[in-house]
Design a protein with these regions (language model features):
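Solvent-exposed loop and beta-edge segments used for protein-protein assembly and interaction
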Residues: 47-49, 76-78, 106-110, 164-168, ...
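Intrinsically disordered, low-complexity segments enriched in serine, threonine, and glycine
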Residues: 131-284
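Short beta-strand and beta-hairpin "edge-sheet" elements
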Residues: 22-23, 81-128, 267-270, 283-284
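Short, acidic/charged, Gly/Pro-enriched secondary-structure junctions
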Residues: 58-101, 253
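Charged, amphipathic alpha-helical segments and their flanking helix caps
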Residues: 69-76, 126-140
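Oligomerization/assembly interface segments of phage tail-like spikes and tubes
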Residues: 32-63, 108-122, 252
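Solvent-exposed edge beta-strands and adjacent loop segments
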Residues: 1-50, 89-102
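Structural motif
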Residues: 9, 86, 187-189
Length: 284
């Protein structure tokens, strides 16, 4: 583990891997457990829920614990979680809800065991953004052929490739850039559609993560509109038209309905802090 930080809901950052304040280990945070119900020949109702873990903090300057505990308590009082970040990439929302002394403190050393509520049930890591800027023939919404027909033809859909390297279906966020009307795109066998107008200079943001599902439109002047109810949900996950459907593993065909650009960010998810974070300068 190279880095460990706690960021409170108001943006205060507590460095938990500094010279004068550090976490001894992340042992309990590396473990995980699924919640499930036994079925006749297997399991059902599978989920990963919030859990508690112990985090041991050591310091050579005990006074710095006061600032840390102030940030921890402010989040609990506001009922707004902070965020733990490991190695600058793996994150989970968390509360610090209690503490106990690991050793008798003295002016130059203290060890405190904190009780952490891990809110999300998983750790998430954002993968590099994939940018897609499809172009159809011409710059308008129709293809103008060099012969007279009763109507011009609609542009053909553009096929691109999305790569999900996680080995499992991935949560994602997407940003669609205007102008466009009722934008939709297809990945694999699912169509992601929102019945909304995205203005020129604006964008639509779609969040399909386990911790947050939202759809908003941001105008050029910065005004934000909540359009959550305009997302097409079909008959739910697996129906082929669910706007929050996780993206399948591997390479999938991406088909875009128009001339709008898409920024797609997928998330790797782990039940516990990944073991590969052990290979670093500070043992954890």
């Amino acid at each position: 583990m190279r880095e460990l930080k706690y960021t409170s809901h108001d943006g205060t950052v507590i460095d938990l891997n500094a010279d004068d304040l550090w976490v001894a280990d992340l042992q309990e945070m590396r473990g995980y457990a699924w919640t499930y119900t036994l079925a006749t020949r297997g399991i059902k109702s599978v989920s990963r829920n919030a859990s508690t873990a112990k985090m041991t903090v050591r310091t050579k300057t005990p006074a710095v614990l006061d600032a840390a505990q102030t940030a921890f308590d402010a989040d609990v009082q506001a009922v707004r979680p902070g965020t733990l970040t490991v190695d600058g990439e793996w994150t989970q929302q968390a509360y610090v809800v209690g503490s106990s002394l690991g050793l008798v403190p003295w002016p130059e050393y203290a060890q405190v065991d904190y009780t952490i509520v891990l809110c999300d049930g998983v750790w998430r890591r954002a993968l590099p953004v994939q940018h897609f800027f499809p172009m159809t023939a011409g710059t308008g919404s129709q293809i103008d052929l060099p012969l007279d027909l009763p109507t011009d033809l609609a542009p053909s859909k553009i096929a691109l490739t999305v790569n999900n390297p996680t080995g499992k279906a991935a949560e994602f966020t997407a940003v669609i850039f205007g102008p466009c009307v009722n934008p939709s795109f297809q990945i694999g066998g699912n169509t992601y559609a929102v019945d909304v107008t995205v203005p020129e200079g604006g964008h639509m943001s779609l969040s399909a993560t386990g911790s947050r599902k939202t759809i908003t439109v941001t105008a050029e002047n910065g005004d934000v509109s909540d359009v959550f109810d305009r997302g097409v949900r079909g008959n739910g996950s697996g129906s082929g038209s669910y706007v929050f459907e996780p993206i399948p593993a591997g390479d999938s065909l991406l088909t875009v309905s128009g001339n709008f650009g898409i920024d797609l960010t997928m998330f790797d998810v782990s039940g516990g802090v990944p073991w590969r974070t052990l290979s670093s300068q500070t043992a954890s």
